[in-house]
Every structure is written in C-alpha cells, then in structure tokens.
C-alpha cells in the first residue's frame, strides 16, 4: 500500500524559544476524517478529500468559481477537523515559518511551485491554529516535493 504524506514543520518564534511541530496528513488521517465526514453527512457518497496533499494550482485555478469555492470549503472543513483532532485549535500562533513537504504517489514530474497550500493555510487560520496567514504572522513558507 502506498503511503502519501504531506508533512508540515512549523517553527514558532516566541520571545525566547523556538518550538517545532510536525503535522502529517496521510491516508490514515483521510480514513479517520472520512468516518467523521460520513457521520456528519449520511447522504454523501463521494470522499470529501481525494488525496492527502493539496490539489495542484493547475487543477483549481481553471475551475469555475463555484467549484473552486466548494473545493476550498472542503479543505477548510478538513483542516479545521485535523487541527482539532491534533489538539491545536485556537493555539493562535503569532509568528511562524512553515515547511510543506509533499510525497506524491508516483514518480511523475511535479513542479514544486504548483503545490501552493492555499486552502490548507486558510484552514489553519480559520481553526485558530495560526492568527493569520499574512506576512506578519507567517514569515516564511518552504515548499518541497519528494
């Protein structure tokens, strides 16, 4: 069984210390979320999140506005659940740096700049995990593919 991972390393820069958190979204995380999701939406048949990594910017930028908003909402709901499940809701991180590492299921060529985690960052802000995803609070983003 292939394992797809999207890992986040977060460096929290408080007054005198740096704390590192590693958050991982994999197939097990998606399975847990699907159980929760289908309990909340018993008539739903389709998985809300297809892969444990953010959709490529090439996929969602060409969508019509309603489809893109629906995808964004699904990811926001998923990330809010994920952060709550990790126990980090309303952490309100003031400043941080993030490293996003995406492990794809194939060795097909991927452009690292297409992995922009916009929907995930919006979910982080909405859940209260970070204060906001603006430049004052999110000082640096590093994108990696493996």
Predicted regions and their residues:
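Catalytic phosphate/metal-binding cores of nucleic-acid and nucleotide-processing enzymes, i.e., regions
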Residues: 2-146
